[in-house]
Amino acid sequence: MNPLKKKPRTHSLQNAPEKPDWLKVKLAFPDPKNNPVAIVRNSLEEKKLNTVCESASCPNLNHCWSRKTATYMLGGDICTRRCSYCDVASGKPFPLDPEEPKRIAESSIALGLRHVVITSVNRDDLEDGGAAHFAKTVKEIRKGLPDCKIELLIPDLKVKQEALEIIFECNPDIFNHNLETVKRLFPEVAPQKRYERSLDVLKIASARGFLTKSGLILGMGETLEEVKECMQDLASVGVSLLTLGQYLQPTSTHLPVKEYVVPQVFKDLRIYGKSIGFKGVFSGPLVRSSYHADEQISWNP
């Protein structure tokens, strides 16, 4: 574990409510020599690659890896921003590894992936925010897997037009940028992000004709009405696909869970999302942005 994760957070610590049964996930790994989870893990370790699955302590890691799917994380494992809910380490990142895009492509080919999700830490230390690194990775994957769907889950890149153009030119199948939470909570939850800036990124991508996607994490203190307003904002800028999931506190020093949202509310929000124009809404307590990402394009309950 990166020692930077041990830095105390600045918010006041509170006791989270007890985790309900519907969120209790077994993380038991089978025999490491004969299971898909081990195959994915070994491939990632061999290529010295980072995944958001591990870095963000995703509860679905076992499930997704058993399906031979993973979300690659570019730019190292240290983020230049510090969000109170996120388990990715923050600090001063190392220089980009120029061979990382090639290794990600080799891993994708070895695993026979049909849908690759690529994200990154925030790299505000770079002029283009890491956009060219994304583009190079897409190019390498398409060389070896020309029919593979590629989803890019990008930071806001500070809405720099030159950086966004680099992303657009590599023509991802899905352009994903997560809003994460409602406008009121941004100062507490993601103080270095801006609500309007994230909407602008998605609006620009939608206007350019890309299939756009975003996600919200619930249970951080938002109201149901605020969630619906946020969904309306996303729909108004042309977002087609939406994911809604439950926030889970990674450690005792992170933002406490304010509420465990019951499954019925997620179902109701899915119906509401469809009613205001989203093409697909993937909503449930354990849903994450890249959970079953290959199915989300056509998912329509």
Curated annotation (Swiss-Prot):
Recorded GO MF terms: 4 iron, 4 sulfur cluster binding; lipoate synthase activity; metal ion binding
Cofactor note: Binds 2 [4Fe-4S] clusters per subunit. One cluster is coordinated with 3 cysteines and an exchangeable S-adenosyl-L-methionine.
Annotated compartments: Cytoplasm
Cofactor(s) recorded in Swiss-Prot or TrEMBL: [4Fe-4S] cluster
UniProt pathway: Protein modification; protein lipoylation via endogenous pathway; protein N(6)-(lipoyl)lysine from octanoyl-[acyl-carrier-protein]: step 2/2
Gene3D superfamilies linked: Aldolase class I
Key word 4Fe-4S present: yes
The entry's keywords: 4Fe-4S, Cytoplasm, Iron, Iron-sulfur, Metal-binding, S-adenosyl-L-methionine, Transferase
Catalytic activity: [[Fe-S] cluster scaffold protein carrying a second [4Fe-4S](2+) cluster] + N(6)-octanoyl-L-lysyl-[protein] + 2 oxidized [2Fe-2S]-[ferredoxin] + 2 S-adenosyl-L-methionine + 4 H(+) = [[Fe-S] cluster scaffold protein] + N(6)-[(R)-dihydrolipoyl]-L-lysyl-[protein] + 4 Fe(3+) + 2 hydrogen sulfide + 2 5'-deoxyadenosine + 2 L-methionine + 2 reduced [2Fe-2S]-[ferredoxin]
This protein's GO CC annotations: cytoplasm
UniProt keyword Cytoplasm, yes or no: yes
InterPro entries with a match to the protein in the record: Aldolase_TIM, Elp3/MiaA/NifB-like_rSAM, Lipoyl_synth, rSAM
NCBIfam families cross-referenced by the UniProt entry: lipA, PRK05481.1, PRK12928.1
The name this protein goes by in its record: Lipoyl synthase
Gene that this sequence comes from: lipA
